[in-house]
Amino acid sequence: MRTIDKRIAPNVRLAATLVARAPALTLAYDARCKSRLAATLDTGEDVALVLPRGTVLRDGDVLVADDGALVRVAAAHEAVLLVRAPDALTLTRAAYHLGNRHTPVEVGAGCLKLEYDPALADMLTRLGATVERASAPFQPEAGAYGGGHRHGHDATFAEDYALAQQVFDEHHGHSHSHSHSHSHDHDHDHDHDHDHDHQHGPSCSHGHHHGHR
């Protein structure tokens, strides 16, 4: 059994004829989120998918097997919900409530697409949206920080949040440290001046009272 263990970076340009000749690996979104997977190419060949943890495959990705052969990824048709609305406000509200539930969503022109879920379909209908069940490829938005994780699971959402926090710290950590140091210096100077006046200041009120004792 061949092992597929590499994904060619999207910015690497390959000859179209070379990619077209490569066998396809057709997977639904749930399977494309798995870095370890036993799968079957469209040719009928069984393969083992062993990719870096956290990899999310997208339609059109090109993979490399352990023998150097190319394999192209295709998004399978699956049960989805197509969400439309009579106005932008209703569609925005629908997107907000889906995001609040960490639901993977594919954003189209005037339409949202998500995996079929009857409970979500009912919620969206109550919000005033029009919901249609269909069979189509599903390719949701990637994570804002490149993680691309499946947000429906708390563990992967926590990973995306941790990554977002790391990016924030990298951009703002230095200025925060500088401010902290400044505050520390200020406190030090303040304490020093206070001690100096207490020991030597003839007009210090504490010294004046002490003299009367």
UniProtKB/Swiss-Prot annotation:
Using the UniProt annotation, give all residue ranges assigned to the region (Disordered): 170-213
Can you tell me where the transmembrane regions are? none
One cellular component term (GO) for this entry is:
cytoplasm
Keyword check for Cytoplasm, yes or no: yes
| MF annotations from Gene Ontology | nickel cation binding; unfolded protein binding
Q: Which UniProt keywords apply?
A: Chaperone, Cytoplasm, Nickel, Nickel insertion
Q: Which portions of the chain have biased composition (kind: Basic and acidic residues)? A: 182-200
Q: Name one GO biological process term.
A: urea metabolic process
Family according to the record: Belongs to the UreE family.
HAMAP family according to UniProt:
UreE
Write out the function statement from the record: Involved in urease metallocenter assembly. Binds nickel. Probably functions as a nickel donor during metallocenter assembly.
Name of the protein in its database record: Urease accessory protein UreE
Gene encoding it?
ureE
